[in-house]
Regions:
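Periplasmic OmpA-like peptidoglycan-binding domain that tethers envelope proteins to the cell wall
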Residues: 49-51
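Catalytic core of pol beta-like nucleotidyltransferases
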Residues: 1-33, 41-47, 58-103
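Short hydrophobic/aromatic beta-strand micro-patches
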Residues: 54-56
Length: 103
Protein backbone atom coordinates (compact mmCIF):
# COMPACT_ATOMS: atom_id res chain seq x y z
CA UNK A 1 0.00 0.00 0.00
CA UNK A 2 1.39 3.40 -1.00
CA UNK A 3 1.06 6.28 1.47
CA UNK A 4 0.59 9.91 0.43
CA UNK A 5 0.56 13.12 2.51
CA UNK A 6 -2.94 14.60 2.77
CA UNK A 7 -1.90 17.93 1.22
CA UNK A 8 -1.02 16.40 -2.14
CA UNK A 9 -3.20 17.31 -5.13
CA UNK A 10 -4.64 13.94 -5.91
CA UNK A 11 -6.95 11.50 -4.27
CA UNK A 12 -4.97 8.46 -3.11
CA UNK A 13 -7.74 6.13 -4.25
CA UNK A 14 -7.66 7.54 -7.79
CA UNK A 15 -3.89 7.10 -8.12
CA UNK A 16 -4.00 3.57 -6.71
CA UNK A 17 -6.79 2.74 -9.15
CA UNK A 18 -4.67 4.06 -12.04
CA UNK A 19 -1.68 2.04 -10.86
CA UNK A 20 -3.79 -1.12 -10.72
CA UNK A 21 -5.10 -0.43 -14.22
CA UNK A 22 -1.53 0.21 -15.46
CA UNK A 23 -0.29 -3.01 -13.89
CA UNK A 24 -3.11 -4.99 -15.53
CA UNK A 25 -2.42 -3.44 -18.95
CA UNK A 26 1.28 -4.20 -18.65
CA UNK A 27 0.73 -7.76 -17.41
CA UNK A 28 -1.68 -8.38 -20.30
CA UNK A 29 1.04 -7.12 -22.67
CA UNK A 30 3.39 -9.79 -21.30
CA UNK A 31 5.36 -7.94 -18.63
CA UNK A 32 6.71 -10.20 -15.92
CA UNK A 33 7.36 -7.39 -13.39
CA UNK A 34 6.04 -3.83 -13.09
CA UNK A 35 7.65 -1.14 -10.92
CA UNK A 36 6.70 2.39 -9.92
CA UNK A 37 9.43 4.98 -9.39
CA UNK A 38 9.80 8.76 -9.38
CA UNK A 39 7.62 11.28 -7.58
CA UNK A 40 4.59 8.97 -7.34
CA UNK A 41 6.73 6.32 -5.61
CA UNK A 42 8.31 8.85 -3.28
CA UNK A 43 4.95 10.38 -2.38
CA UNK A 44 5.80 13.92 -3.49
CA UNK A 45 3.88 14.11 -6.78
CA UNK A 46 2.31 17.37 -7.90
CA UNK A 47 -0.67 18.13 -10.11
CA UNK A 48 1.52 18.03 -13.23
CA UNK A 49 3.40 14.86 -12.26
CA UNK A 50 3.45 11.87 -14.55
CA UNK A 51 3.59 8.21 -13.62
CA UNK A 52 7.02 6.60 -14.00
CA UNK A 53 6.83 2.87 -14.66
CA UNK A 54 9.56 0.35 -15.33
CA UNK A 55 8.97 -3.15 -16.64
CA UNK A 56 10.65 -6.46 -17.32
CA UNK A 57 9.43 -8.85 -19.99
CA UNK A 58 7.75 -6.48 -22.45
CA UNK A 59 8.34 -7.61 -26.03
CA UNK A 60 10.13 -4.72 -27.81
CA UNK A 61 7.67 -4.77 -30.71
CA UNK A 62 4.83 -3.98 -28.25
CA UNK A 63 6.61 -1.16 -26.39
CA UNK A 64 5.14 1.86 -28.21
CA UNK A 65 1.67 0.36 -28.59
CA UNK A 66 1.59 -0.42 -24.86
CA UNK A 67 2.90 3.03 -23.94
CA UNK A 68 0.19 4.66 -26.07
CA UNK A 69 -2.48 2.43 -24.50
CA UNK A 70 -1.31 3.32 -20.98
CA UNK A 71 -1.50 7.07 -21.59
CA UNK A 72 -4.95 6.78 -23.18
CA UNK A 73 -6.40 4.50 -20.51
CA UNK A 74 -4.92 6.40 -17.55
CA UNK A 75 -5.57 9.82 -19.10
CA UNK A 76 -2.19 11.13 -17.97
CA UNK A 77 1.45 11.22 -19.04
CA UNK A 78 3.34 7.99 -18.46
CA UNK A 79 7.09 7.48 -18.66
CA UNK A 80 7.67 3.82 -19.48
CA UNK A 81 11.14 2.31 -19.11
CA UNK A 82 12.12 -1.14 -20.36
CA UNK A 83 14.34 -2.41 -17.53
CA UNK A 84 15.44 -5.34 -19.69
CA UNK A 85 17.38 -2.74 -21.71
CA UNK A 86 18.08 -0.32 -18.83
CA UNK A 87 19.42 -2.69 -16.17
CA UNK A 88 21.87 -0.18 -14.70
CA UNK A 89 19.01 2.30 -14.19
CA UNK A 90 16.96 -0.41 -12.46
CA UNK A 91 19.92 -1.30 -10.22
CA UNK A 92 20.49 2.36 -9.29
CA UNK A 93 16.80 2.90 -8.44
CA UNK A 94 16.78 -0.31 -6.43
CA UNK A 95 19.94 0.68 -4.57
CA UNK A 96 18.54 4.06 -3.51
CA UNK A 97 15.22 2.46 -2.51
CA UNK A 98 13.06 4.28 -5.06
CA UNK A 99 11.38 1.25 -6.63
CA UNK A 100 7.96 -0.02 -5.62
CA UNK A 101 6.84 -3.27 -7.22
CA UNK A 102 3.21 -2.95 -8.30
CA UNK A 103 2.87 -6.03 -10.47
Amino acid sequence: MLHYPAELWYNKTVIESKLLKASNILKNAGCTSVYLFGSQAKGNARSDSDIDLGVFGLVPSLFFKTHFLLENELDMKVDLVDFDHEKSFFEMLNQIGELKKIG
